[in-house]
Amino acid sequence: MHKKVLLAILDGYGISNKQHGNAVYHAKTPALDSLIKDYPCVMLEASGEAVGLPQGQIGNSEVGHLNIGAGRIVYTGLSLINQNIKTGAFHHNQVLLEAIARAKANNAKLHLIGLFSHGGVHSHMDHLYALIKLAAPQVKMVLHLFGDGRDVAPCTMKSDLEAFMVFLKDYHNVIIGTLGGRYYGMDRDQRWDREEIAYNAILGNSKASFTDPVAYVQSAYDQKVTDEFLYPAVNGNVDKEQFALKDHDSVIFFNFRPDRARQMSHMLFQTDYYDYTPKAGRKYNLFFVTMMNYEGIKPSAVVFPPETIPNTFGEVIAHNKLKQLRIAETEKYAHVTFFFDGGVEVDLPNETKCMVPSLKVATYDLAPEMACKGITDQLLNQINQFDLTVLNFANPDMVGHTGNYAACVQGLEALDVQIQRIIDFCKANHITLFLTADHGNAEEMIDSNNNPVTKHTVNKVPFVCTDTNIDLQQDSASLANIAPTILAYLGLKQPAEMTANSLLISKK
């Protein structure tokens, strides 16, 4: 019988032996529990060197889907940039040097925009420090910094700023122009009202201002506002002409991960990706640079252009003239398409893409079920048409990021109902379910001091197959082993570029 496969990726669903604050453990999820207990299952590495990140670095959705789709370890933004800084190549990068030179030639400013974080998921503070060391001796610099509070603890910006302000004392050419939370400046669900507030601050206009960056963040903490939700504020110590974005300025967006940088990039530098124009208009003749390639954005230049990843999982399916479906809600749609396909936007032969709209709520603890039922409804209507379906459920990650433990438990329990529907449908229709995750999150929601945890983890993730005629090797394995395993299961030849091994063991 011709085999059909569903690969279900539970975003942020890690496994931990620690029970305290573990929403995965405490949620009533009989369907998921049964899959892991009763079927072939192996625990996969989803962080650090096993997925192309520095040792001990937490995994993330972008890297996770890249490795799953590539069938090999993919060295991405963080490791690549770190290595360039270490070798000194960073300081000779021609794109960075051109951004500096253009600002000097135009008697203009160089703006650095990005996430102020050591989380290493979207950006890293070390890269900001390196950029300042490179450019500050040569040109006036303005920093527009977004607080994190998701990929690190909710209130880390103050201590990070304290150290940063000491560093800046040696660089008199550098000022912090604006501060704000990623909730405003790094949305990815077209909530343009939020982006407008952050963008207007970059233009020099906000109802909030600061004279002391550290004190401004502390005042937010006093009002129970964490880094993520810091209201965009402008520097009140200087005239706005000293920090506001102007015509002919240079801009470096130092996030290396694209999904939460695209919308602000569109506000700054017109693209064809979105049908939206900022109310205040755009500045002219910007030299706009992105650290990595941002899907759908065509900047003036890219500091580290993408390296091609040939023969991805999706390409192998297409080359074999098989039909495939990619399905997720808005929040994770790019992950099962762009990232899964090696960091490129591509429409493969016999491929269908389905995006289910994410719910319009301020934070997902307000609707922890998210769009999991809508995704499942769409899935069950279409899946029989396809040989391979790749699905993402966002609940464990997106609700996990809110730090709301009770809501995360609710989200997992709502998700489990849909998982049971999928299991039943797959059994009735002879579809093999492979279930995994891209990284951990929901299994660590409360720390030992009973503080909420909002960031990803370094825990392993499950990889389950519902075909009991096979088994899975229990040796050390990672996300990169998933594609080779499913290709072997489908009887398809693994391409040479896909260097990870299949974990498949046949019992027959």
UniProtKB/Swiss-Prot annotation:
Output the CDD domains linked to this UniProt entry. iPGM
A GO molecular function assigned to this protein is: manganese ion binding
Tell me the InterPro entries matching this sequence: Alkaline_phosphatase_core_sf, BPG-indep_PGM_N, Metalloenzyme, PGAM_B_sf, Pgm_bpd_ind
| Known cofactor(s) | Mn(2+)
Gene Ontology cellular-component terms for this entry are: cytosol; membrane
EC id: 5.4.2.12
**What remark does the entry make about the cofactor?**
Binds 2 manganese ions per subunit.
Q: Enumerate the Gene Ontology biological process terms.
A: glucose catabolic process; glycolytic process; positive regulation of fibrinolysis
Identify the catalytic residues.
S61 (phosphoserine intermediate)
Its UniProt pathway annotation is: Carbohydrate degradation; glycolysis; pyruvate from D-glyceraldehyde 3-phosphate: step 3/5
Positions bound to Mn(2+) 1 = D397, H401, H456
Indicate which residues the UniProt annotation says bind substrate: H122, R150, D151, R182, R188, R257, P258, D259, R260, K332
Signal peptide span: none
Metal-binding: is it a keyword of this entry? yes
Which residues are Mn(2+) 2-binding?
D11, S61, D438, H439
Which reaction(s) are listed as its catalytic activity?
(2R)-2-phosphoglycerate = (2R)-3-phosphoglycerate
Pfam families membership: iPGM_N, Metalloenzyme
What keywords is this UniProt entry annotated with? Answer: Glycolysis, Isomerase, Manganese, Metal-binding
> Source organism's superkingdom?
Bacteria
Assembly: Monomer.
Family, as annotated: Belongs to the BPG-independent phosphoglycerate mutase family.
Q: What does this protein do?
A: Catalyzes the interconversion of 2-phosphoglycerate and 3-phosphoglycerate.
Q: What is this protein called?
A: 2,3-bisphosphoglycerate-independent phosphoglycerate mutase
